[in-house]
Amino acid sequence: MTLDPYTAVGLIPEITEIRHRDDIATNLEHLHKLARTAVAMGGLDLPVKLLVLPEGSLQGFTDEIHDLDHATYARTCAIDIPGPETDELGSWAREFGVHIMAQAKARHPEFPDRYFNVGFVLDPSGDVILRHYKLTPLPPIEHSVSPHDVLDLWTQLHGRGPDAFWPVADTPIGRLGVMMANEASYPENARGLALNGCEIAYRTSFPLPGVASGAFEIQNRARALDNTMYVLAPNPAAYTGSDGLRADFFGGQSMIVNHVGHPLGRVNHGGIATFVTATIDLAALRRQRATSAWTNWTKDLRTELYQTLCEEPIYPANLYADRAPLHHAAYRQQVTEPQIELMRTRGIWR
């Protein structure tokens, strides 16, 4: 493994909403053109070894926006990993000589008519070397199944260890993990990655109003600082829906944050396709972890104390073990409102 610094490139694409799996080809064509320029320009100082595609780059957010039937989306829009789409991305990995981190709504062979939100990593040979199944989809609008929604069967298939929920790929360019989009709104997911060895975390995409409020940047920087790891957070530029409306629902603020919480590369604007770059210095990260007496916080976790916070369940496990994910209004009524009441009943909220 080389510890020489290298460049990471995050694409900031314009996304076209899909209505069928075949429509992904339109986004792939755009992404490839953007990647060619981004890798060429991004590598002028140091070689590009990591290429990052934001969540939604392949399929858009059709299910969230249109409150689609889950099983129908699984059959018509979700992909298989590996499959033709990841094969295409794999050809780019070989073309550019890079690792690629990306995302797709994808099926799982053990869960018919269901799809998960999957972050994945391709190595420079084009092989899929990591799949991360999103643990905390965006409530109440995202219909992706979480491993927690089918927890009993998931643990039968994958076990209960960190690799079942926060897998990390140990690669020549560092240990790569995924906490996409809303997952990073929960510090526990970043900590799960860090405790499984993650050094470089994929965190993208995030919508308005959470970007304009500052939440996106606060979370990115805090997760990096708390866990002494890089956070890669390119945000999409614009979105064209099936009705033809082109709009920026994301608000820019694409960034790559280093292991001490400083944004190294940043593009503030949205609206037009571009890219963000930064230097990844693994040697500096590992030195910080190995020599700091204070700010390598993870070494000081008093885990016996924190375990007491999790003895009582909060969000219900196995919510979709026997049914498809709920539509927006039903989710609000059957999940969101009871969860708020639970916090009050326990005396946590007033």
Write out the residue ranges for each language-model feature.
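Active-site-proximal beta-strand elements of phosphoester/diester hydrolases
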Residues: 3-20, 24, 52, 175-183, ...
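Conserved beta-strand and immediately adjacent loop positions that scaffold enzyme active sites
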Residues: 7, 116-118, 165, 235, ...
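Short catalytic helix/loop segments, enriched in acidic residues and glycine
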Residues: 25-38
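Cys-nucleophile CN-hydrolase/nitrilase-fold catalytic domain and related Cys-dependent amidase chemistry
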Residues: 36-133, 140, 207-222, 226-227
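CN hydrolase (nitrilase-like) catalytic-core segments centered on the catalytic cysteine
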Residues: 81-101, 175, 181-277, 349
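Short beta-strand scaffold segments in enzyme catalytic cores
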Residues: 102-103, 117-121, 167-169, 254-256, ...
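Active-site catalytic loop in hydrolytic enzyme cores
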Residues: 108-199, 208-222
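C-terminal beta-strand edge segments of enzyme domains
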Residues: 235-350
